[in-house]
Amino acid sequence: ARATIQVYEETAGLMVNDPVLRTRKPLSVELGPGILGNIFDGIQRPLKTIAIKSGDVYIPRGVSVPALDKDVLWEFQPTKLGVGDVITGGDLYATVFENTLMQHHVALPPGSMGKISYIAPAGQYNLQDTVLELEFQGIKKKFTMLQTWPVRSPRPVASKLAADTPLLTGQRVLDALFPSVLGGTCAIPGAFGCGKTVISQALSKYSNSEAVVYVGCGERGNEMAEVLMDFPQLTMTLPDGREESVMKRTTLVANTSNMPVAAREASIYTGITIAEYFRDMGYNVSMMADSTSRWAEALREISGRLAEMPADSGYPAYLAARLASFYERAGKVKCLGSPDRNGSVTIVGAVSPPGGDFSDPVTSATLSIVQVFWGLDKKLAQRKHFPSVNWLISYSKYSKALESFYEKFDPDFIDIRTKAREVLQREDDLNEIVQLVGKDALAESDKITLETAKLLREDYLAQNAFTPYDKFCPFYKSVWMMRNIIHFNTLANQAVERAAGTDGHKITYSVIKHRLGDLFYRLVSQKFEDPAEGEEALVGKFKKLYDDLTTGFRNLEDEAR
């Protein structure tokens, strides 16, 4: 029997007849306390530790460092389980204080079971200390807080559940028009310079997930360096008002384009396995893969080395199957073991098709799998409209699943969103006419539609990720901003129609613009309201604007009669 082995590093030291030993297990990762706040490469080597040990900016050849530090002491707190209790795989038997943001639950590895013959008392232990001993059919087995898991096999769950909670990202265009769910699959395809990485980073910083795994897979080294510089300085505000570092809930898997191809192919699996580990504790985890195109290119390169038959564009024939097997590890699940708990993994994959061509094999295979498509547009990016999500081609198949959430949050929201979509679609239809005959030849209602669409485009969908007031937009602010813009559209159309049927002065779009300029300015300025002032203050301001719009138009109609 022959085995083909791709060597991970320089092969200069090897020669014929050198012995090759099997590790007797597939590529596995170490899972335990200490993962959060760490940065690994594609095969889970800790890059910080390597940098300190080697004192070099590059990873030296042949360096081998354990993924998790085995000597750090962790505060171990067992649950109510005691000696003589029976426990099975997935049961949580202790908690470990990981950091002020995350409580780390220690579970029995899947596939193990038995009667507890020893459980460590509360205290400080490292990852080599035995904290649990089980007896099953007369055989005793010891467990530490550390477990290993092969990256290519999904971790088992009790059952899959239907997702019904939205993934709130803080980006208005995504939350309002194309929402995803906790446990969803999203794709962000876009050409270079469209802002894929900024959207991925915004998701990592501000989304309502409890843990984030960010996989930089084959992207430029300076992008990962930027993430490494930014994330430790970023803070998130907790419901009780505390400021905590985003790094405390984040794990980075950095695999830049100058690292070996084999690790690039493995890095996505490493990331998803770490995400599943936190999901099994009952957390909602989101995983960003930036970018799956580079991962597919690594597959293509390895497939070429193995002399497999190439398919479309040189990619292997099993590309779609590999992508599907990765994306299907997302989802909301009922976790194994007791206590009863639900967790979820949301996957957001950035795709960078060459030249922004969406018919590329990786993009088309991804779009047939994922449920949410946030399509980035080069033209919008060139107009400096960010996030450059094209609202005409993007879609979300989760709108139906989230209806019950929206009904509870705000019963009017679904109608408002439908109207906003209609306005944006109508604007696209009118643009051709405007280019032929100019704006003045349009009907008054069409002029109002164009103005509303401009408000939606420039002051609602566009969002500046580098300002304190707009870097994160809470959902209540998104809803109220959209409500006021659509309210303006409805009132303006009503005013024009009513005045047309009377003998008084006609109300035209230019009259509205001239007479209600101050209200118009306030509509444009809604985005400058800072969420730091608190929900009550902001909703009060938005309600006042809503009432002022109603009053302003009523007065205008009275004068026209």
Swiss-Prot record:
Stored SUPFAM superfamilies: C-terminal domain of alpha and beta subunits of F1 ATP synthase (SSF47917), P-loop containing nucleoside triphosphate hydrolases (SSF52540)
N-terminal signal peptide: none
GO-annotated cellular components: plant-type vacuole; proton-transporting V-type ATPase, V1 domain
Expression by tissue: High expression in the mesocotyl tip of etiolated seedlings compared to the base.
Binding site for ATP: G190, A191, F192, G193, C194, G195, K196, T197
GO molecular function: ATP binding; ATP hydrolysis activity; proton-transporting ATPase activity, rotational mechanism
InterPro entries documented for this protein: ATP-synt_VA_C, ATP-synth_a_Xtn, ATPase_a/bsu_AS, ATPase_F1/V1/A1_a/bsu_nucl-bd, ATPase_F1/V1_b/a_C, ATPase_V1-cplx_asu, P-loop_NTPase, V-ATPase_asu
EC number: 7.1.2.2
Keyword tags: ATP-binding, Hydrogen ion transport, Ion transport, Nucleotide-binding, Translocase, Transport
Subunit structure as annotated in this protein's UniProt entry: V-ATPase is a heteromultimeric enzyme composed of a peripheral catalytic V1 complex (main components: subunits A, B, C, D, E, and F) attached to an integral membrane V0 proton pore complex (main component: the proteolipid protein).
NCBIfam families the UniProt entry points to: PRK04192.1, V-ATPase_V1_A
Descriptive protein name: V-type proton ATPase catalytic subunit A
Organism of provenance: Zea mays (Maize)
Lineage of producing organism: Eukaryota, Viridiplantae, Streptophyta, Embryophyta, Tracheophyta
